[in-house]
A protein has these predicted regions:
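N-terminal signal-anchor/start-transfer transmembrane helix
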Residues: 5-22
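Structural signature of hydrophobic alpha-helical transmembrane segments
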Residues: 1-10, 50-58, 107
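Membrane-water interface at the C-terminal end of transmembrane alpha helices
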Residues: 13-17, 68-76, 103, 111-135
Length: 149
């Protein structure tokens, strides 16, 4: 059931954000990524050791860093980060021992992340959505020239 709720909630948020224009702002999905990554830090604060908190902060920092790079250069990096966080949700219990993470969380958050990533990638069909104004994506440069500029 957690998978279904994550999927439906992600689609609902995405469609609502598009419908009212929230995702026209380049910052929307990077902020979503940072907030999603912060939940494990919250769980660690609620009931885990300092060691777990530090591990969660490091992971959050990595995802937040990719989100910020995506905001600055190419939002497709944010879609990749969301998908990677979805995978991370499923391996998290094997990497970081945390007694405060609810049992249903990996299924819920993982499905939310993957659906949000897919939706953000789907939005890439809109020209100019993913690359910061005045920049060409390195992916586009590579496609045109076969080289990274």
């Amino acid at each position: 059931m957690a998978y279904v709720i994550g999927l439906v909630l992600a689609l609902g948020v995405a469609v609502l954000a598009t419908g009212v224009g929230l995702d026209r702002d380049r910052a929307f999905y990077p902020v979503v990524m940072i907030v999603i990554a912060a939940y494990y830090v919250l769980f660690a604060v609620m009931g885990d050791s300092t060691r777990t908190l530090i591990a969660e902060l490091l992971v959050m920092g990595a995802f937040a860093g990719v989100a910020l790079l995506g905001f600055r250069f190419d939002l497709r990096l944010v879609a990749i980060a969301l998908a990677a966080h979805g995978v991370f949700d499923f391996v998290h219990p094997h990497l970081i021992a945390s007694s405060a993470v609810p049992q249903w969380w990996p299924a819920f958050c993982g499905s939310y992340d993957v659906v949000a990533a897919a939706y953000l990638a789907w939005l890439s069909r809109r020209p100019g959505t993913f690359v910061a104004p005045g920049r060409r994506s390195q992916l586009d440069v590579f496609a045109d020239t076969g080289r990274i500029a």
